[in-house]
Amino acid sequence: MNYLLEYCKQIEAGNIVVGKELGSTLTKLRLDLTNPKYHYDEKPGDLRIEFIETFCKHTKSPFNGMPFKLTLWEKAILQVAYGFKMSDSKFRRFNEVVLLIARKNGKTTFVAGIDLAEFFLSKGVDIVCASNTSEQANILFEEINNMREASKALEKRTSKNIFCIKFGKKNNNKSRHNMNKSKIKKMSAQSKNKDGYNIEVGCIDEV
């Protein structure tokens, strides 16, 4: 299903209310679906949607322990962010997404699910949770870890230390030669060392 078109359809039917700026952005994106400059592929977004809804669970009350079922707008933004590609190069059109959401509307939970999807679906990448302060950067990092621990399938393949979340268990002596080397780390403006990261996904909060 094309969730971008379905989202626009629900807005036009009056079932969903959006602001003027978002409405204009959606109109442009819908027109770009037929623009020969771009190719739209639903599969990359669908892959991440399937991962989140299969393996991720809520960790906060009142939904603690319940499966994370994405809303229509969340599915739409994942398809758009990963689905639009340049027709000539096949590179992704969008490398940055600005997400403006009011407090207590699930922003951290949503981003944590995306980070876990990238962690498991990519290889050898650094996923960084960043903010102005270490305390703020730690909020997303801990939500990712809580979501990881809530899933037996994810937890048994990974571990956490004071520096990062990584593949492999602490007491497992099995060779890491063929193991996924991806890591999830946290970083703030207060961090002394900001170099040496191969950042595939950078989530910047409260900037």
Annotate each predicted stretch with a short phrase:
Residues M1-V207:
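Phosphate/NTP-binding elements of NTP-utilizing enzymes
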